[in-house]
Amino acid sequence: MIQPQTLLNVADNSGARKLMCIRVIGAAGNQRYARIGDVIIAVIKDAVPKMPLERSEVIRAVIVRTRKEFKGDDGIIIRYDDNAAVIIDQKGNPKGTRVFGAVAEELRELNFTKIVSLAPEVL
């Protein structure tokens, strides 16, 4: 569960390394916590030098991994090693061209098919 002030890793090659959540947008109105597939507004806390994204930029991101376990549609409980997000634009397309690490199958149902297709492993 991701809430404001939570630090997240970035799971793509957009140039950012760490994000801090500042607002949960989500899909179900006024949510307090973000889960896998929810959209957040975040600020970049650490970035690779000489890349398009810089420190202290406010961006949108979708959660792809959380340390808090969740039950999948088939009843399997999944928990990841870190909290991670992929930076997206206003249309929901990823800004990077690669996605690192595994992502959840539930992203496909939430119309983030581009992120799922870029991921090396889908759980």
UniProtKB/Swiss-Prot annotation:
Belongs to the universal ribosomal protein uL14 family. Keywords: Chloroplast, Plastid, Ribonucleoprotein, Ribosomal protein, RNA-binding, rRNA-binding. It is found in: Plastid, Chloroplast. HAMAP family: Ribosomal_uL14 (MF_01367). Its main location: plastid. GO terms for molecular function: large ribosomal subunit rRNA binding; structural constituent of ribosome. GO terms for cellular component: chloroplast; cytosolic large ribosomal subunit. It comes from Sorghum bicolor (Sorghum). Binds to 23S rRNA. Gene3D superfamilies: Ribosomal protein L14. One of its GO terms (biological process) is translation. This is Large ribosomal subunit protein uL14c. Part of the 50S ribosomal subunit. It comes from the Eukaryota. NCBIfam families: rplN_bact. SMART domains: Ribosomal_L14.
